[in-house]
Curated annotation (Swiss-Prot):
Taxonomic lineage from the root: Bacteria, Bacillati, Bacillota, Bacilli, Lactobacillales
Residue intervals of the EngA-type G domain: 4-167, 175-351
Native source species: Leuconostoc mesenteroides subsp. mesenteroides (strain ATCC 8293 / DSM 20343 / BCRC 11652 / CCM 1803 / JCM 6124 / NCDO 523 / NBRC 100496 / NCIMB 8023 / NCTC 12954 / NRRL B-1118 / 37Y)
Gene name linked to the record: der
Protein name: GTPase Der
GO molecular function: GTP binding; ribosome binding
Coiled-coil stretches: none
Subunit structure: Associates with the 50S ribosomal subunit.
Record function comment: GTPase that plays an essential role in the late steps of ribosome biogenesis.
Length: 436
């Protein structure tokens, strides 16, 4: 059975993200005193009393005509539909508000267990402030302080009471992949088109996707994936707004937490320097890579358009010569059905292991074709090679003198390894060591 899901809902600035972060044990959600900052659902694992579960932090529900109001409402409704338990957060400091009553009315219709958390009860003298919230009709209010961690144990005790009895620890074999790229290249639209569910708010405002959101799905073939849609990463030296700066930090963490990276390029805008910076970070992290050219439907084409664009990509992204390229349209759905299988294939290659005997046969055949270089009368001698790691595949080559291994010859050996084994989509690392 999959882990139970707990949705944290409520109007803006009652401290949902603070409680979320306390339960998750790290700063997952963006926390800022600006209504509407937590605009998309955030997912994070948590554990209490040997129960593992997943939490969803939603954008707040607010009365008024704010630009994101209708979409945020929709996000909360989706979270409610997915949750096993709902935690409604209110503010003991501000007291009961009309917006709280609106949220409660939404929850009446959910037929899901609801636990009422009165946040910002930062000292015992404030505990009497919780009684007004009985008027919401959601049962006993639990006084907590997200900022100080007070009362969260009692709250978690109540939450896990509502979990199905079968809830148990599960090992996660899903393939994790991130979708990265500059703002407005269509990352969120690709997510929505692939999932068939409006899981991420999409608008034409740069930076709408403010944080990384984990989304689990299973294909018809039974392959399980966790997709992480990240905020558009800006160049690190040009980040001024606090929220955006933190989003970039989270995006980098999402890359670290992923097996495979989908690098999205805007076909209309072409390739920019920032695309190369973003791709470079993922490459340096050693992740498997796929280059996704989005908005291909908007390009006027002839019989050479695709090959010309592919050549441009290969020229601009020389360090990603191993990455397959796919031309898609999130708007029309063109070729999006290929992405899950491509992700699985490059992940398999990322995890691939080659036996030492087979590897050494390839190395020795390569040396027979192109003998090792020499310097000042001393010739490089290659003794043997072995694979020492996967993700990415990493090989150690033992030689007589590391200084004799020219970069060009190391590249030659890497190419021969790639020719012999399918490492499409994954970087490979060669480590040259002197045999003692």
């Amino acid at each position: 059975m999959s882990a139970p899901i707990v949705a944290i809902v409520g109007r803006p600035n009652v401290g949902k993200s603070t409680i979320f972060n306390r339960m998750a044990g790290e700063r997952i959600a963006i926390v800022e005193d600006m209504p509407g900052v937590t605009r998309d659902r955030l997912y994070a694992p948590a554990e209490w009393l040997n129960y593992e579960f997943r939490m969803i932090d939603t954008g707040g529900i607010e009365i008024g005509d704010a630009p994101f109001l209708a979409e945020i409402r929709g996000q909360v409704e989706l979270a409610i539909n997915e949750a096993d338990v709902i935690v409604m957060v209110v503010s003991g400091r501000e007291g009961l508000t009309e917006a709280d009553e609106v949220v409660a009315r939404m929850l009446y219709k959910s037929d899901k267990p609801v636990v009422l958390a009165v946040n910002k009860v930062d000292n015992p003298e404030m505990r009497h402030d919780v009684y007004d919230f009985y008027a919401l009709g959601l049962g006993d209010p639990f006084p907590v302080s997200g900022s100080h961690g007070l009362g969260l144990g009692d709250l978690l005790d109540e939450i896990v009471k509502h979990f199905p009895d079968e809830a148990a620890e599960q090992e996660d074999d899903a393939i994790r992949f991130s979708i990265i790229g500059r703002p407005n290249v269509g990352k969120s639209s690709i997510v929505n088109a692939m999932l068939g569910e409006k899981r991420v708010i999409v608008s034409d405002i740069e930076g709408t996707t403010r944080d990384a959101i984990d989304t689990r799905f299973v294909t018809e073939e039974g392959d399980e994936f966790v997709m992480v849609d990240t905020a558009g990463m800006r160049k690190r030296g040009k980040i001024y707004e606090n929220t955006e700066k933190y989003s970039v930090m989270r995006a980098m963490k999402a890359i670290d937490d992923s097996n495979v990276i989908l690098m999205v390029i805007d076909a209309e805008a072409g390739i920019r320097e920032q695309d190369k910076h973003v791709a470079g970070f993922a490459h340096e992290a050693g992740r498997a890579m796929i280059i996704v050219v989005n908005k291909w439907d908007a390009i006027e084409k002839n019989d050479r358009t695709m090959s010309d664009f592919e050549n441009l990509i290969r020229e601009e992204f020389k360090f990603l010569d191993y990455a397959p390229i796919v031309f898609v349209s999130a708007k029309t759905g063109q070729r999006l059905d290929r992405l899950p299988q491509m992700v699985k294939d490059v992940d398999d290659n990322h995890r691939k292991r080659i036996t030492s005997s087979t590897l050494n046969d390839v190395i020795m055949d390569a040396i027979a074709i192109n003998p090792t270089p020499s310097d000042n009368g001393r010739r490089l001698r290659v003794y043997y090679a072995t694979q020492v790691a996967t993700q990415p595949p990493t090989f150690v080559i033992f030689v007589n003198d590391v200084e004799l291994m020219h970069f060009s010859y190391e590249r030659f050996l890497e190419n021969k390894i790639r020719e012999s084994f399918d490492f499409t989509g994954t970087p490979i690392k060669l480590i040259v060591r002197a045999r003692k």
